[in-house]
């Protein structure tokens, strides 16, 4: 594997004209123009969606030396470079806007932004809020990332969720540090370095295994420190200035060294400078040791080890002269000098890609060697040219990559709710009624209870316990995502949306309880099924009560037809379920058309219900036909579930190996195989006759050998391939429907496309 495919070295004479002191070679991605285009696109998109003026004054990745993305991702091909640079700048913009708010406003915006990515969060998610606009913007770029590399894109989001502690833009108190190591432990999370490397992996299309990470761990330790502390070093003057002028927090390794070693600012900066040089030398020594100990080290690991060093050097070089870190000097109006009492550096080498300024340039006295070197942009006019004519504005106290990852972590941590394992809201206790009943019960003597003729409600603890349990289970949140995505077109007010979510969740969770009982299923989403904890009778009673609650919610809608809509779709749901149970009990395999009709009523009924309720509650007058889309999505969702149950390791973990076979379920792959292979009918009949059908007898799993044989038959007969091709046809039809509706409404819907892409069975 060639190490340097997408980058070129920076000339020594260019490096010497900057205050950069990195000892490592500096390279830049050959496609700096792609990175610049991505930055400008991020600015345009931000301005289009948010209209807050931030894009006009922001200083982000563009500089005369090159784009931050081109230095941070030197070995990333153009298509992926555009994605990661865009995300980096999007994060910087979000962080700037967030930091500019007062604390109360910032916290409100942060909560609402988080609510938009959590399908079961009950905070309002109004379309007009800043968070809602950001959600749509982020959904689009995440969709593009998944389309480029679905597996790596999803891995990146998963790692964000598992390895990143989101920074809430200044919320919380920064601890006092007793050592730089203690500070580093804090900053690894605050900075986002754990999430940055998955971003690099996505960019380089290089998935590191656990064994790979263990092998390169000695190298990554100094690299992590160098990236974080390099940013701290070059941003310290600006952050110090802002802490003096507006009281912003100062979280910086220079400040930590100054405090714990009782040094002056100049002494602390000199100490950090030496620490950075030492870290780079430590990286080189450990790199040589790894190569010596592993002469046959895989080529992809050798490339990774080389690239991370270049990333340190490149971001160091960029930060040494970037307008983001240095332009504040010329925008200051209070006369404060930089913390090191040195004038802003100026770079006199004209850029090949941007117009150079003929304005005045300042000279910098280098504190280390006494030489005078012209370095970085010195006046507002130059900065305007170097940043695509962006005017100066307030900057945050963080790092460009920390800022990028702050947004991405908040997005991916909550976007994961699109995909794997976010938990349902717990059903809310009706505390006032329950407390009243308890006090009423306890306040009576035994004799007065026997003589009392007044009626009162007992406590709801027993009734609610199974409900709380099923609602606590993790969920993919597909239906909640669809409600939010449909609302881009239907524009239902938040009050009605909250009721619709509540009603749909009640029905869905009630159906899960009953399905598990009817299917004799011992597990649900990797946990014991509700009836195995609370018993069949109590579980059924609570599920029935959830239907009562759903009717109560339906009566609260403005549209008087809501209850009728609910009852009609409940009838369809029960009709569909009746045939699913009938086929199983009588061991009669349906035809493919019969099966699809069952799906349209059972699975599609819930999708159709949420759509009809939204249409009934919408305020707009423009008619939007979404009926066909819900039918297609219901079929796609159910058939995909059938397919994955027999093919996916995740389903094995959560439900057991091929649990549909244990249940005796005539799922879509079984139905198709029976329709096309007569001999399979006898085989599957014989298999299913081995399982009990009486609800009291419980389910006895089929022998693993039998299930493996059935799966192998489905595979060799081409049934799985047929199912996958049918799912891809459904995907294409859904995409065509989305295209049609987007044209009719003139409203793009990246959230719905992102949801479909996540569920896709297409190969990457």
From Swiss-Prot:
Catalytic activity: isopentenyl diphosphate + (2E,6E)-farnesyl diphosphate = (2E,6E,10E)-geranylgeranyl diphosphate + diphosphate; isopentenyl diphosphate + (2E,6E,10E)-geranylgeranyl diphosphate = (2E,6E,10E,14E)-geranylfarnesyl diphosphate + diphosphate; (2E,6E,10E,14E)-geranylfarnesyl diphosphate + H2O = sesterfisherol + diphosphate
Record motif DDXXD 1, residues: 95-99
Span list, region Terpene cyclase: 2-331
Cofactors required: Mg(2+)
Binding-site positions, Mg(2+) 1: 95
Motif annotated as DDXXD 2, chain positions: 515-519
Region called Disordered, residue ranges: 347-372
EC number(s) stated in the UniProt entry for this protein: 4.2.3.176, 2.5.1.29, 2.5.1.81
Annotated residues for binding of isopentenyl diphosphate: 476, 479, 508, 525
Source taxon at top rank: Eukaryota
UniProt short sequence motif NSE/DTE, positions renumbered to this chain: 231-239
Residues binding Mg(2+) 4, per UniProt: 515, 519
Pathway: Secondary metabolite biosynthesis; terpenoid biosynthesis
GO molecular function list: lyase activity; metal ion binding; prenyltransferase activity
Ranges of compositional bias, category Polar residues: 348-358
Keywords of the record: Isoprene biosynthesis, Lyase, Magnesium, Metal-binding, Multifunctional enzyme, Repeat, Transferase
Binding residues for substrate: 95, 187-190, 231, 235-239, 324-325
Entry binding sites for Mg(2+) 2: 95
Cystine connections: none
Domain comment in the entry: The conserved DDXXD motifs as well as the NSE/DTE motif are important for the catalytic activity, presumably through binding to Mg(2+).
Oligomer and partners: Hexamer.
Free-text function comment from the UniProt entry: Bifunctional terpene synthase; part of the gene cluster that mediates the biosynthesis of sesterfisheric acid. The bifunctional terpene synthase NfSS converts dimethylallyl diphosphate (DMAPP) and isopentenyl diphosphate (IPP) into sesterfisherol. The C-terminal prenyltransferase (PT) domain of NfSS catalyzes formation of geranylfarnesyl pyrophosphate (GFPP), whereas the N-terminal terpene cyclase (TC) domain catalyzes the cyclization of GFPP to sesterfisherol. The cytochrome P450 monooxygenase NfP450 then catalyzes oxidative modifications of sesterfisherol into sesterfisheric acid.
Protein name: Sesterfisherol synthase
Source organism: Neosartorya fischeri (strain ATCC 1020 / DSM 3700 / CBS 544.65 / FGSC A1164 / JCM 1740 / NRRL 181 / WB 181)
């Amino acid at each position: 594997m060639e190490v340097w495919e997408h980058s070129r070295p920076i000339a020594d004479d260019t490096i010497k004209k900057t205050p950069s002191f990195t000892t490592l070679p500096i390279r830049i991605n050959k496609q700096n123009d792609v990175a610049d285009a991505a930055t400008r696109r991020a600015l345009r998109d931000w301005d289009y969606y948010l209209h807050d003026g931030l894009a006009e004054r922001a200083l982000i990745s563009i500089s005369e030396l090159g784009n931050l993305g081109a230095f941070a991702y030197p070995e990333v091909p153009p298509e992926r470079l555009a994605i990661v640079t865009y995300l980096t700048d999007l994060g910087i913009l979000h962080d700037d806007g967030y930091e500019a708010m007062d604390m109360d406003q910032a916290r409100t915006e942060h909560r609402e932004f988080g609510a938009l990515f959590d399908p079961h969060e009950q905070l309002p998610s109004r379309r007009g809020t800043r968070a809602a606009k950001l959600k749509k913007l982020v959904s689009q770029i995440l969709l593009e990332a998944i389309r480029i590399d679905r597996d790596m894109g999803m891995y990146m989001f998963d790692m964000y969720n598992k390895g990143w502690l989101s920074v809430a833009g200044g919320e919380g108190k920064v601890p006092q540090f007793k050592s730089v190591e203690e500070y580093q432990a804090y900053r690894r999370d605050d900075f986002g370095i754990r999430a940055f490397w998955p971003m690099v992996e996505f960019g380089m299309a290089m998935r590191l295994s656990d064994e790979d990470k263990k092998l390169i761990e000695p190298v990554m330790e100094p690299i992590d420190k160098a990236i974080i502390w390099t940013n701290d070093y070059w941003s310290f003057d600006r952050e110090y200035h802002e802490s003096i002028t507006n009281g912003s927090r100062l979280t910086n390794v220079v400040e930590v060294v100054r405090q714990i070693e009782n040094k002056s600012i100049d002494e602390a900066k000199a100490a950090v400078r030496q620490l950075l040089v030492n870290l780079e030398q430590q990286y080189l020594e450990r790199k040589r040791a790894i190569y010596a100990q592993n002469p046959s080290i895989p080529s992809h690991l050798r490339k990774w080890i080389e690239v991370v060093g270049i990333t340190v050097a490149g971001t160091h070089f960029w930060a040494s002269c970037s307008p983001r870190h240095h332009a504040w000097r010329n925008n200051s109006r209070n006369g404060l000098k930089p913390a090191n009492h040195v004038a802003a550096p100026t770079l006199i080498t004209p850029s090949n890609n941007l117009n150079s300024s003929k304005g005045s340039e300042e000279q910098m006295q280098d504190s280390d060697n006494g030489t005078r070197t012209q370095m970085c942009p010195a006046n507002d006019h130059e900065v305007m040219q170097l940043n695509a004519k962006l005017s100066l504005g307030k900057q945050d106290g963080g790092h460009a990559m920390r800022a990028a990852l702050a947004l991405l972590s908040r997005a991916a941590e909550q976007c994961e709710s699109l995909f794997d394992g976010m938990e349902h809201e717990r059903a809310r206790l009706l505390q006032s009624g329950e407390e009243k009943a308890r006090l009423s019960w306890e306040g009576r003597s035994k004799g007065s209870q026997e003589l009392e003729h007044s009626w009162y409600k007992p406590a709801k603890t027993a009734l609610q316990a199974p409900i709380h349990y099923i609602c606590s289970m993790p969920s993919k949140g597909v239906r909640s995502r669809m409600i939010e995505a449909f609302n881009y077109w239907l524009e239902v007010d938040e009050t009605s949306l909250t009721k619709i979510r509540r009603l749909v969740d009640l029905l869905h969770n009630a159906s899960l309880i009953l399905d598990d009982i009817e299917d004799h299923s011992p597990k649900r989403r990797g946990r014991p099924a509700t009836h195995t904890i609370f018993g069949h009778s109590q579980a059924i009673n609570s599920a029935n009560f959830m239907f009562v609650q759903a009717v109560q919610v339906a009566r609260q809608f403005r549209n008087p037809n809501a209850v009728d809509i609910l009852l009609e779709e409940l009838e369809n749901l029960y009709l569909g379920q009746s045939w699913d149970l009938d086929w199983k009990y009588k061991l009669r395999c349906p035809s493919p058309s019969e099966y699809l009709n069952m799906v349209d009523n059972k699975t599609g009924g819930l999708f159709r219900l949420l759509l009809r309720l939204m249409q009934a509650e919408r305020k707009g007058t423009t008619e939007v036909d979404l009926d066909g889309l819900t039918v297609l999505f219901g079929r796609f969702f159910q058939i995909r579930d059938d397919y994955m149950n027999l093919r996916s390791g995740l389903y094995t973990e959560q439900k057991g190996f091929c649990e549909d076979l244990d249940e005796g379920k005539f799922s879509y792959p079984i139905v198709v195989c029976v329709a096309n292979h007569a001999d399979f009918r006898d085989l599957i009949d014989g298999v299913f006759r081995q399982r009990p059908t009486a609800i009291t007898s419980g389910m006895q799993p089929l022998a693993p050998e039998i299930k493996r044989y059935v799966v192998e038959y489905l595979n060799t007969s081409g049934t799985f391939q047929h199912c996958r091709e049918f799912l891809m046809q459904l995907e294409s039809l859904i995409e065509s429907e989305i295209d049609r509706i987007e044209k009719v409404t003139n409203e793009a819907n990246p959230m719905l496309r992102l949801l479909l892409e996540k569920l896709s069975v297409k190969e990457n």
